[in-house]
Amino acid sequence: SLRRRQRQMCIRDSSSVGGKTGVNLPEGKNLVGTFKQPAYVCASTAVLATLDDREWACGCAEIAKASVIDSDEFFFWMMDHASALEARDPVVVTEAIARSVVFKANVVAEDKTESRGVRECLNYGHTLGHAVEALAGYGTFSHGAAVAEGMRFAARLGVDVVGTSAELVDAQDELLDALGLPALAWSAPAEEMLAAMKRDKKTRAGEVRFVLPRDIGDWELVAVPDEVILEHLRRWEDSKSL
């Protein structure tokens, strides 16, 4: 039987309870993998003290993602405790991980093999995030930093596509900043980013799909037309030159 002992923040609060493995290929991230539920997961917070700031922030990104998708209560708890989490307060860290793991475990229990659409919400921020990782070169940015950038992009895309409020965009930016996840000072040409997105495993029939937040705790999976994606990618690219 499979047993997992988690030593990394990102794994502990996210992939440890996903029951999924993935291998990165030159063409894209996690393009080969399988589903296998562990017999149990051991998550000791004591070893988190060994993580550097980059890996710590990486895990915080996945917790922030969970809070946006889950509920007002989780999100505003994160807003209230972001500074303490970034400072590694042990009580806050334990609570944040517990909330994130419960959220993901509940989602996975409903859709263990990504066949019902429920689990798609866990890809929030990952469509642009995976493209950033692939084009910048794996390891250039942490997975969490790339996902945080993808969350910023998806929220702004959501304003035009599903009516996401400007208040949500600003609140999410504030949370990510407080967790040590500033906007990346990096970009790639819009056409290259779109091509990388089309190689992502979430693409269907050539259509790039985004998880977009209508509101905190309310999301929609949308196949966004290429021209709309390119328009927003050009805005994103231009914002890096300011």
Where are these regions (language model features)?
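Structural motif
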Residues: 22, 30, 39-41, 145-146, ...
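Short coil/turn connectors at secondary-structure junctions
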Residues: 5, 36-38, 207
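Active-site segments that bind and position negatively charged phosphate/pyrophosphate groups
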Residues: 81-191
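C-terminal charged capping/lid subdomain of soluble metabolic enzymes
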Residues: 61-63, 163-242
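Active-site-proximal loop->helix
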Residues: 12-33, 174-175
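Single conserved hydrophobic/aromatic residue that forms the stacking wall/gate
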Residues: 1-11
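Carboxylate- and glycine-rich phosphate/diphosphate-binding segment that chelates Mg2+/Mn2+
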Residues: 29, 36-121
